[in-house]
Swiss-Prot record:
This is MATH domain and coiled-coil domain-containing protein At2g05420. It comes from the Eukaryota. Keywords: Coiled coil. InterPro entries: MATH-CC_domain_protein, MATH/TRAF_dom, TRAF-like. Residues 7-139 form the MATH domain. Residues 239-281 form a coiled coil.
């Protein structure tokens, strides 16, 4: 039996959460304590949960051993872990749950079948921002029995890297470019906890990606959502003058596009109607005259 303490904190951003159709989804794998792990979520509830009341209308979230079949007989992992459902508007409203468990071949999954009622998730402001749900997992392996030569390299989607005090997912180049072009972007940023910083940065990157698209590719809902995201980020202390200007330009272009499209459709309809009138006149002019005997003789 080997004693060791190995820990890792990962962030899982679930996009388009409200429109997910799958009964369950899982994160990419990550390595802690010579073991591959992943998070598994049930967006509409775990129908196999022990307690009937937990089976529906709750977000269920679990920590799973991803490579359990590869371990030797008798393997175990004594693990302490926490799962945080991030409220991106107020860290005080974030939901933290903790557990300690011996994982083995009979018990490869541990978690929380009622992390939060879905009604609370969808109605409370801050958990879902731009359709994204952010989860943070801290996994500490306290004791190891049975080792495998597993790669320490985790999926780049999961690892976080420090950039100007922000623990960011591997959009590191995008974040570096933001800070290089806008040095004071976060000079008045208030939240201090790492997972809150990560959540805000994810919103900022998503917003930047949205505003880089052509107005033609954006719906009015997209533009409205971008405006809400700007307000949300500005209230946290981000300085985003250039994005606000970009958002205003996109709104104006979208209005002009819609006005021009409406006028074009009106003109096409008018031309079509006029064409129908002239078509009828042409057909009438081509029609042969009918003659009877009284007209001829």
């Amino acid at each position: 039996m080997g004693k060791q303490v190995d820990s890792k904190t990962i962030t899982w951003v679930i996009e388009n959460f409200s429109s997910l159709q799958s009964a369950s989804i899982h994160s990419d794998q990550f390595v802690v304590g010579d073991c591959k792990w992943r998070l598994k979520a049930y967006p509409k509830g775990n129908e196999k949960a022990t307690y009937l009341a937990y089976r529906a209308n709750n977000l269920a979230l679990y920590l799973n051993v991803a490579n359990s079949k590869s371990f030797p007989i008798g393997w175990t992992r004594h693990t302490k872990f926490s799962l945080t459902l991030v409220n991106q508007k107020s860290e005080k409203l974030s939901k933290l749950t903790e557990s300690q468990h011996w994982f083995d071949h009979k018990s490869t999954s541990r978690g929380f079948p009622a992390m939060i009622p879905l009604t609370n998730l969808h109605t409370n402001e801050g958990f879902l921002v731009n359709g994204e749900l952010t989860l943070v997992a801290k996994v500490e392996v306290l004791e190891v029995v049975g080792k495998l030569d597993v790669s320490k390299k985790s999926s780049p989607v999961m690892e976080t890297i420090d950039v100007n005090g922000f623990q960011v997912l591997p959009q590191i180049e995008s974040v570096n470019r933001l800070f290089a072009k806008h040095l004071d972007i976060a000079s008045k940023f208030r939240p201090k906890k790492p997972y809150m910083k990560t959540a805000y940065m994810n919103v900022l990157l998503s917003l930047t990606k949205t505003l880089c698209q052509s107005p033609q590719d954006l719906s009015n809902d997209d533009i409205s959502g971008a405006g809400a995201a700007l307000t949300y980020l500005r209230e946290a202390g981000f300085k985003l003058d250039w994005l606000e200007k970009k958002h205003g330009e996109i709104k104006e272009k979208k209005k002009k596009e819609e006005a021009s499209l409406k006028r074009l459709q009106e003109m096409e309809k008018q031309i079509f109607n006029e064409a129908q009138i002239y078509k009828e006149k042409v057909l009438a002019a081509r029609a042969p005259l009918s003659l009877n005997e009284d007209n001829v003789f």
